[in-house]
From Swiss-Prot:
Domain notes: Class I metallothioneins contain 2 metal-binding domains: four divalent ions are chelated within cluster A of the alpha domain and are coordinated via cysteinyl thiolate bridges to 11 cysteine ligands. Cluster B, the corresponding region within the beta domain, can ligate three divalent ions to 9 cysteines.
Lineage, highest ranks first: Eukaryota, Metazoa, Chordata, Craniata, Vertebrata
Transmembrane segments: none
Entry-linked Gene3D superfamilies: Metallothionein Isoform II
Highest taxon of the lineage: Eukaryota
Name of protein: Metallothionein
Keyword terms, alphabetized: Metal-binding, Metal-thiolate cluster
Binding residues for a divalent metal cation 4: C32, C33, C43, C47
Homology family: Belongs to the metallothionein superfamily. Type 1 family.
Region (Beta): 1-28
Residues where a divalent metal cation 2 binds: C6, C12, C14, C25
PANTHER family xrefs: METALLOTHIONEIN, METALLOTHIONEIN-1X
Pfam family for this entry, one: Metallothio
Residues at which a divalent metal cation 1 binds: C4, C6, C20, C23
């Protein structure tokens, strides 16, 4: 289950930094909004993105 409930009263900011405000998540998931640049296939399946760019450290 996705612990991020930004759509239920919080805001998910996934520009340069993946952060959510007024919600229970500390990392931004694809189900909130895309953290990684478009065209990053390994971030397209809902994993937690940790960073600004699409590289080996992007997803855990």
């Amino acid at each position: 289950m996705d612990p991020c409930e930004c759509s239920k009263g919080g805001t998910c900011n996934c520009g340069g930094s993946c952060t959510c405000t007024n919600c229970s998540c500390t990392t931004c998931k694809k189900s909130c909004c895309p953290c990684c640049p478009s065209g990053c296939p390994k971030c397209a399946s809902g994993c937690v993105c940790k960073g600004k760019t699409c590289d080996a450290a992007c997803c855990q």
